[in-house]
Amino acid sequence: MKKKTYLFALMAMALTLGSCSDNENGIGGETSKYITVSTSIGNMTRVATDEKGGQTFEEGDEISVYAWTGDATVAPETRERVVNNAINKLTNGSWISNPQMLWKNNRDKHYFIGVYPISAISDLSAGEYTFDVNKQTESDLLVAVNKDGLSYNVDEQQTVPLIFTHVMAKLVVNLTYKNQWGTEGPTVDKVAVGNAAKKATVNYLTKVVTPSAVAEDKADFDMPALTANKQYASIIIPQDGVQKITITIGGKDFIYDNGTPFKFESGKITTVNLEVGRDVIKLGDVSISDWGSTGEPIKGEAYD
């Protein structure tokens, strides 16, 4: 999977996935063998951008698709799925499905779940999730749910709208420095998040993420640098148990204690702006925003 660029944009594109006719149920004809799916990713997107600013998935990207009939509000077990983890890969500008997606019949409404990156999920109501700070692309998670449903109609070319949204949270830490560090500023050893949940369960039908409450599933982790010494960012499981961020410079820890735990929310970015002095860190603000908008800052202060 190629590294993605996070953009403040809305991406929409159509993809065609193969299907087969069901003559037994009256769905005949070679012209009726395709399901057209339109996809969009709301607000802050996880896609590539071209020189003109257009947004697309990249060649070779893949999504998992699940489909079922019956109750739209109940995530289906494996044996009840009409489509079970059909991998759709962007190949030469077209989405190729493996295995082919098949209509069950032309009577029942079909409901759909899309997952990016691809994932084989046995329990769609409580899928296991593990965060890996060293695999940011794989740890991000976008989910699309179509609960309106679609029935096959031989006389129409239907599209199945799949609107993907981020279900994980994102943390960004921006660092600035007092002039006592000089014009170039210091070299940061690391920026660490304290006592964060690294495992969770995901309900793919409702997009609800439940972090693990087990102590063994929590740990400190170092944030990847977007710009060394200046900006650090990471995917993080939605949770409300993290209270401290530590900046290490020259072996010395500067600890920001929020006083109360942060609330990292699904589909939102928490941005922490810190000004670092030699003896004290001052908090400029903390903002919480949707991926694609700005939030109101929460004022505060922090010390080493």
Predicted region positions:
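Sec-type signal peptide cleavage vicinity
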Residues: 2-304
